Amino acid sequence: MNSLSFLNHEFEAFPSPELALTDPNGLLAIGGDLRPERLLTAYYHGIFPWFNADDPILWWSPDPRAIFIPGQVNISTSLRKYLKKQPWRFTINHAFTDVMAGCAQPRRKQAGTWITHEIQMAYRELHHNGHAHSVEVWHGERLIGGLYGIAIGQVFCGESMFHRETNASKAAMAVLQQHLIKMNFKLIDAQVMNPHLESLGAKPVKRADFIQLLTQFRDKPVNPAAWIPSEVTLEL
């Protein structure tokens, strides 16, 4: 029977993801902190933090795991037509803090958000250190959508997305896929399946298979120019 591990503030190794609980699915450890080195170690081993504002830090590695393969994100014909008509522009790493703030806004029928101030500060530090990245969708000078995540070698670990205009988050996903293909990324970790991710083409895989893919690509070199702030054209 698997048991929950408790972390202290000393830097220590995470338990194996195979030891995560089945109920709640994927809960592996509790406690610790959100220092950059601990966060990067977590993602390197297929673990991520997810907790509410009043909770201790909770670390997860669910089974199954939601993933995308770059090139297999579903950009439907109707979505392509819709996006071609929009006057939107797209950037990478131009407004990371604002994207996180957008993602942190409570959704409809939600009282709060898991993207707490503590989480935002931690990931902003990762961004400053070159590990966390954002995609932005703009209508004029207004930020209308975007997403952010962590790059580990040739793996992009998606964290959250948001939209303020219809389909803007899907546009951000299309931009991300295009960019990752150009930069030879091999895997997008989407963490937990939900209907929105499924509609975009996410697939559930066994945790062991995900860890195998992560291990295969997490140490692969990446183009040094991959995450230089830039404006991009979405090719539809």
Curated annotation (Swiss-Prot):
GO terms for cellular component: cytoplasm. It comes from the Bacteria. GO terms for biological process: protein catabolic process. The keyword Cytoplasm applies. Its EC number is 2.3.2.6. It is found in: Cytoplasm. Keywords: Acyltransferase, Cytoplasm, Transferase. SUPFAM superfamilies: Acyl-CoA N-acyltransferases (Nat). It catalyses: N-terminal L-lysyl-[protein] + L-leucyl-tRNA(Leu) = N-terminal L-leucyl-L-lysyl-[protein] + tRNA(Leu) + H(+); N-terminal L-arginyl-[protein] + L-leucyl-tRNA(Leu) = N-terminal L-leucyl-L-arginyl-[protein] + tRNA(Leu) + H(+); L-phenylalanyl-tRNA(Phe) + an N-terminal L-alpha-aminoacyl-[protein] = an N-terminal L-phenylalanyl-L-alpha-aminoacyl-[protein] + tRNA(Phe). The keyword Cytoplasm applies. Pfam families: Leu_Phe_trans. GO terms for molecular function: leucyl-tRNA--protein transferase activity. Belongs to the L/F-transferase family. HAMAP family: Leu_Phe_trans. Functions in the N-end rule pathway of protein degradation where it conjugates Leu, Phe and, less efficiently, Met from aminoacyl-tRNAs to the N-termini of proteins containing an N-terminal arginine or lysine. This is Leucyl/phenylalanyl-tRNA--protein transferase. It comes from Shewanella sp. (strain ANA-3). The lineage of its organism: Bacteria, Pseudomonadati, Pseudomonadota, Gammaproteobacteria, Alteromonadales.
